[in-house]
Amino acid sequence: MIKLTGINKIYRTNEIETVALENVNLEVNKGEFLSIMGPSGCGKSTLLNIMGLLDAPTSGTIEIAGTKVDGMKDKELAAFRNRKLGFVFQSFHLINSLNVLDNVELPLLYRKVSAKERRRLAEEVLQKVGLSHRMRHMPTQLSGGQCQRVAIARAIVGNPEIILADEP
């Protein structure tokens, strides 16, 4: 499902070069769960962002769900990400101007799923995470744990092949 080969990530400024990842090789097969642990600043989020195609490595190759993504244009990567990957971000990244239901529907909107089907799927997944009674609430009206469940609902609503979670 995910195969990283020789992944390196170097952040450069005028004065300093920081090696975040060095020669990372990783393979995660269908049905496997992987937990990446380590101290703050060791590259966990950088690795997750590269695995999730949100950031590009300095060098190395990435294969997701049998597709080599090296060389894909930004628009292709965005469409691929939306079809194959679900994300639960450490800071949730909920849109405060949208209610819970609309936040969960968002990935389906990008996939051009009909409004009726988006609503049905979002309501179904909110029921599963125990938040159907909060559908019309805004993210600022929720607890941290509830926001986390909204983020999980948004990640799984499109039934992605792969779910990536940063400190879920």
Feature map (PLM): residue ranges:
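ABC family nucleotide-binding domain
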Residues: 1-168
